[in-house]
C-alpha cells in the first residue's frame, strides 16, 4: 500500500513538474513581415518592436517566449484552437475582436496614413479624389475595414497578405494609393532605398469604431491570470525605462 501510494505521489509530482515546465514557456503568435513591428533579419532571426517588447515582457515575468509565425487571416482562430497562448502582432483593440479574445492593456497607439508615389497627382484621400482608383490594404486589418466601408463603392480595394506585397504592386503601378499603420508605411515606403513616396492627408486615428484603442496582446478570454501578468510586466517596463529604450530604437523619439 505504501509503495502504491508512493508511486502515485511520485507520478503526480512528475505531472506537476511537467505542467510547470510547460507554463514557463509562452507561445506568442506573430504575422510577418510588418516592419518595423515584426520582421526577419537576413539571418532569419525575428526582430522588431513587438518582438523585442514581447521578449522583455517575458523576461520581466520570468518565462520564456516562443514565437510562432502565423498568417493574419488565421491568427485568431489559431489562438482559439490553442496553437499558441497569445497574439502579439500589432493587433488593434476593438469591440469586434473583444467578442473573441481578451486584450491586454494597450502597449502602442499608432495612427494610420495614406501613402502614394511621390509623382502621384493625388493630394488628398477624399472620396471623390479616389473614385476609380486602386487602394491597397492588408487583408483583415482595420485599414481594410475602413477602406472597404468608406471607399468600397467608388474605388477598387485590393487586399494583400503582407505590406511587402503591397509595395511590390505600388512599384509596378498596379496601385494608386495604400492605407497602412503609419510606422509600417514609414519603414516600408518612406524610409526604403527608393524612398519615392509621400503621405497625403493627415494622421488618422478616428473614428474609434475602426481605429480602436491601440495595439494589445490578445489572449483566450478565460486566460485572465496570464493577461494580468503581462499587464503588470508592461507597467514595470514603462516605469523602469525599458519600454522607452525599445521605443526609441525603432521610432527615434521618446514615447510621451
What is each residue range found by the language model?
Residues 32-35, 46-59, 113-163, 182-184:
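Bilobed "Venus flytrap"/periplasmic-binding protein-like clamshell domains
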Residues 32, 109-116, 193-231, 251-256:
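Periplasmic-binding protein-like
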Residues 74-77, 89-99, 146-149, 176-211:
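A ligand-binding cleft/hinge motif common to bilobed small-molecule-binding domains
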Residues 56-60, 68-69, 73-85, 100-102, ...:
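Short helices/loops that flank or line small-molecule/ion binding pockets
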Amino acid at each position: 500500500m505504501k509503495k502504491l501510494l508512493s508511486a502515485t505521489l511520485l507520478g503526480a509530482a512528475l505531472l506537476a513538474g511537467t505542467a510547470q515546465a510547460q507554463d514557463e514557456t509562452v507561445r506568442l503568435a506573430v504575422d510577418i513581415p510588418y516592419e518595423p513591428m515584426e520582421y526577419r533579419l537576413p539571418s532569419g532571426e525575428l526582430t522588431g518592436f513587438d518582438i523585442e517588447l514581447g521578449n522583455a515582457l517575458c523576461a520581466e515575468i520570468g518565462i520564456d517566449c516562443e514565437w510562432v509565425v502565423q498568417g493574419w487571416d488565421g491568427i485568431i482562430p489559431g489562438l482559439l484552437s490553442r496553437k499558441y497562448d497569445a497574439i502579439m502582432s500589432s493587433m488593434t483593440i476593438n469591440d469586434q475582436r473583444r467578442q473573441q479574445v481578451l486584450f491586454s492593456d494597450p502597449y502602442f497607439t499608432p495612427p494610420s496614413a495614406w501613402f502614394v508615389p511621390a509623382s502621384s497627382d493625388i493630394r488628398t484621400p477624399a472620396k471623390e479624389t479616389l473614385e476609380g482608383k486602386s487602394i491597397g490594404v492588408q487583408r483583415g486589418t482595420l485599414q481594410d475595414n475602413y477602406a472597404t466601408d468608406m471607399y468600397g463603392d467608388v474605388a477598387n480595394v485590393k487586399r494583400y497578405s503582407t505590406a511587402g506585397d503591397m509595395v511590390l504592386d505600388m512599384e509596378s503601378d498596379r496601385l494608386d494609393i495604400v492605407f497602412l499603420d503609419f510606422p509600417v508605411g514609414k519603414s516600408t515606403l518612406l524610409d526604403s532605398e527608393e524612398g519615392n513616396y509621400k503621405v497625403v492627408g493627415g494622421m488618422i486615428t478616428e473614428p474609434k469604431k475602426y481605429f480602436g484603442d491601440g495595439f494589445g496582446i490578445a489572449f483566450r478570454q478565460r486566460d485572465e491570470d496570464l493577461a494580468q501578468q503581462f499587464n503588470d510586466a508592461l507597467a514595470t517596463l514603462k516605469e523602469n525605462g525599458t519600454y522607452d529604450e525599445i521605443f526609441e530604437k525603432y521610432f527615434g523619439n521618446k514615447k510621451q
